[in-house]
Amino acid sequence: MSTGKRFNRRTVAVLVFAALVLIGLIWDGSPLGSLVLREAVKAKFSTVRSVTPAELVAWRGDPNRPPALLVDARPEAEFTMSHIDGAVWIDPAAPDLSVIANVPKSTPVVVYDAAGTTAAAMAVALRGAGYNRVSYLEGGLFAWANGGQILVDAGGPAETVYPINWKWGRLLKSRYHP
C-alpha cells in the first residue's frame, strides 16, 4: 500500500494543458496559444459563427457570394497602423453603428479584432442591432497576418500589426511587430 498521494487524471490533464499553454506563449506566432484562445472564444460565444482567414480569403474571391462588410473592432490607433482592405472601423469601447447605418441588415458582416475576443462580443451586439448574418474572424488580425494575408493602412500596403503588449504579441509572428 502506498502512502503517497496520486494525481488524478483531471489534475494531470490540467497540468499538461497549462504546460502546453506556457510553451505556446514563448513560441513566435504561438500556434498553440492561438489555438487555445480560439477554442476559448468559440466556447464562450458558441452561438456566433466564426470564419477562418482561409475561408474569408475564399469568400472574398468568390464572385458568386455576396461581399461581406468587414468591421475592425480594435482601438483606432491599431486600425490606423494596419487593417484588412475595405474594413470599416467601429470603436469597440463605444460602438457607433451610424457608420454602417446604410448597410442593409441582411448584408453578411465579418467582425475582427486582434485575436478574436472583442470581435465575437461585437458580433453579438451587431446581431442584437438586427444584423442577422454576422460572424467573427477566428484568430483575428493576428491569424490573418500570420497566414500571410495582405494588410493595408491609409497609404496602401502595410507590414506591421499592433501587437497590444508582450503577452498578446506572442500570438503574432515577430516579423509583423513594429
PLM-predicted stretches and their roles:
Residues S2-W59, T80-T107, A119-P178:
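Rhodanese-like catalytic fold shared by cysteine-dependent sulfurtransferases
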Residues P67, E78-M81:
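Short, solvent-exposed loop/turn elements at domain surfaces
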Residues A68-D72:
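Structural scaffold elements adjacent to functional motifs in cytosolic proteins
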Residues A73-A77:
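Short, polar loop motifs at secondary-structure junctions
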